[in-house]
């Protein structure tokens, strides 16, 4: 890293980010593990993007909001129960979650991301500086570019949601992640750490375990594709039971 810039506007940040050797930083939890050379790091912390605000119909989650803010926000808990606590509590520790950002977790589209898995089963949109508002399910399929993720917009639409994961130890990377939500008989099921970025499918409560079989599973040091496929059915079954019994 040669230069550090804290821009005063999103336009300034966007212009700086058009150079391939420059990089926007969130909490710098994962970027420091990379091997690439970075000329200029762009810090968005002075742009007021670190707040979670609530209206009657939705939440606006700024890209610089931390994972610990997700975990402890009273409005999110009132609306979604323990959903956000469950999708964050295994991520290293509180000190780490106080630094890691929501924007970095989503924009990075990491294969191990608990956060991406969780947001995919809510009515979530991303607001990009140039492209505008895009459904998260579309965003994850878009080519990577030099745009800036400003915020997430999450609808308060009355859906119930549950989050589950399988890990070798409490704070290890997940072997598999699973989130599900139900509204008016329609279920959204997301499975991640397969070991590839999370994806989402629409199904019903009765078909959740079969829907888990439609995802592609692969192998790495944490488990085989066959094992992950088995886990997918198990976690989908547990999510189904939680949704049916209202334990969310």
Where are these regions (language model features)?
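C-terminal structural segment of proteins
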Residues: 1-248
């Amino acid at each position: 890293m040669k230069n550090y810039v804290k821009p005063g506007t999103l336009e300034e940040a966007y212009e700086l980010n058009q150079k391939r050797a420059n990089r926007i930083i969130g909490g710098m939890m994962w970027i420091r593990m990379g091997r690439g050379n970075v000329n200029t790091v762009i810090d968005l912390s002075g742009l007021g993007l670190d707040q979670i605000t609530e209206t009657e119909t939705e939440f606006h989650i700024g890209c610089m909001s931390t994972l610990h803010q997700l975990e402890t926000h009273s409005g999110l808990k009132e609306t979604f129960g323990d959903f956000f606590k469950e999708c964050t509590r295994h991520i290293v520790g509180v000190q780490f979650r106080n630094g890691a950002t929501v924007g970095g977790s989503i924009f990075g589209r990491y294969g191990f991301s608990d956060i991406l898995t969780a947001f995919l089963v809510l009515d979530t949109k991303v607001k990009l500086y140039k492209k505008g508002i895009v459904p998260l399910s579309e965003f994850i399929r878009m080519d990577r570019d030099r745009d800036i993720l400003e915020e997430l917009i999450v609808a308060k639409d009355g859906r119930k949601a549950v989050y589950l994961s399988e890990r070798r130890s409490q704070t290890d990377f997940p072997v598999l992640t699973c989130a599900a939500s139900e509204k008016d008989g329609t279920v959204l099921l997301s499975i991640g750490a397969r070991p590839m970025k999370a994806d989402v499918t629409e199904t019903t409560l009765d078909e959740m375990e079969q829907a888990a079989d439609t995802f592609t599973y692969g192998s790495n040091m944490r488990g085989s594709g066959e094992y992950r496929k088995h886990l997918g059915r198990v976690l989908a079954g547990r999510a189904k039971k939680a949704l049916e019994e209202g334990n969310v």
